[in-house]
Amino acid sequence: MSNPSEQVDGPWDAIVVGSGACGGLAALTLAEGGARVLLIDAGPDLKPQQAFGSEPANLLRRLAGLSSGRHRRQAQHPGYWKANPRLYADELLHPYTHPTDRPFLWTRGLQVGGRSLTWGGITLRLSDEDFSGVEGGDGVIAWPIRTADLEADYAALERMLGVHGNRDGLAHLPDGETCDPLPFTAAERSFADAVQSQLGLQVIHSRGFGPHQPQRDGAWPRSSSCGSTLPQAMATGRVKLLANHLVESLLVEHGSATATGVVAVDQANGNRRSVMADLVVLCASTIQSLAILLRSQEQGLKEPSGRLGSRLMDHVSTSQFFCMPQPGAGSQPPLTGAGSFFLPCGRRLDGADFSGGYGLWGGIGRFDPPSWLRRRPQSVTGFLIGHGEVIPQACNRVTLNGAVDRWGVAVPHIDCQWSSNELAMVAHMRQQMKRCIKVAGGEALPLKELFHLPLVEPLLQGAVALSDAASPPGYYIHEVGGAAMSADPSHGVVDPYNRLWGAPNVLVVDGACWPTSAWQSPTLTMMAITRRACRRALKRRAA
């Protein structure tokens, strides 16, 4: 896609920082509106075979990543063990810090396409209940937008991406413009019937992407920007890609409320270059975008609220494996964003002594290994994962503490921990999961009692994913907040159209702009916000 020898210094109509789910869409939206766009990514532009690799070579790379310390934190996530570790950032080359007693597991994808290449592909809308906010340490923290503001963008994205799902009629999980849902497995249908009839809890088809079909989709999955928005953006002829360049900061005119471009650091040699543009769109992922803004403050960026970097959130989560009687022989369809199920509890929770809501995502009969590796070959294996809303708190924040990378770029210091509210939510999740498993005739068990794992069992000792406790912040890869949108400049960092209050020609459209976390998987809403903000910027440009 890229030709680094071409002139890129500008001036451009727009610079888009990051090429993942939001960055690819921002580039496409702006280019289709007539803007000349430079798309900058910190990582390389990989070919499909380089990105996905194959087994057993990927396994050897995982073991090397663990033993060398390059993937010490990211290897805690189960997704690491089914992907090419090349899609996970080298933690030695790209460090960050956190307090010793408050770990933060930050998963990064430093390549063109970003984390969209490892995204699970679940697409859920937020509701007005979510946008209305949640009770926090600062009172009720709400969004300055509602579902009506994003309706057209949600619908356009769902149609473009071709996601699956039912129309379930839930006020707290609005229906979308989806294709037919993917079918439950026989065990999932049995589970859903039991939970709905005996506990009164609704079990719905998950909403999202089906399995990647190379014959239909091409080499890249449609859930990735490489398989959807990026090739469309490049086909306009108005987008140029600058790979292997990490954006260090905004260029800010002294005493001005305008950014004139960005400073980008060549990852091959550390050389810095100034790239000029009328508009800058930050889509680098939540913490990367916050780090860019924090470094820009040192260059003169004004931020009137004093809230930049504060109120970082991730979804709090916990998981449970189980087995249940096999209701019949059959093939095992793959686990995907749409090939799975949800218990969309939201805030409708009996006996809850905490604020916020959660959902339970699960699958049964989609990932069993061969029978000789199963301790209970007559059963089918399932899992439930709870992910819940987190209360925004000023003490959970991203700052700069003087640590730098190999090229002297200041790296983020992440200080984030769960409060008693999140811990109470996790306890409720675990009770709810065990109730559901029991009424469905299943048995909740640790993974080691379900499978023989002779080669990898030593690696699983102490694994976060197998713990009954709340996983550390960052584990769920749904980090949001730190540059919240607000109705006025004293309560947030960006306005309702994602413009920095201190520099209105800079848009922050990724998860950093979220005032609250809600409980739903965030990517679809991030993309809807991106499309809305970029379309608004095009209207201002035309005027």
Q: What do the PLM-derived regions correspond to, one by one?
A:
Residues 1-11:
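A short, basic/flexible loop-to-alpha-helix module at the beginning of a structural domain
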Residues 16, 20-21, 186, 287, ...:
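Residue-level detector of alpha-helix initiation sites
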Residues 32, 36-61, 249-253, 261-332, ...:
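Glycine-rich loop(s) and the adjacent beta-strand/alpha-helix scaffold that form part
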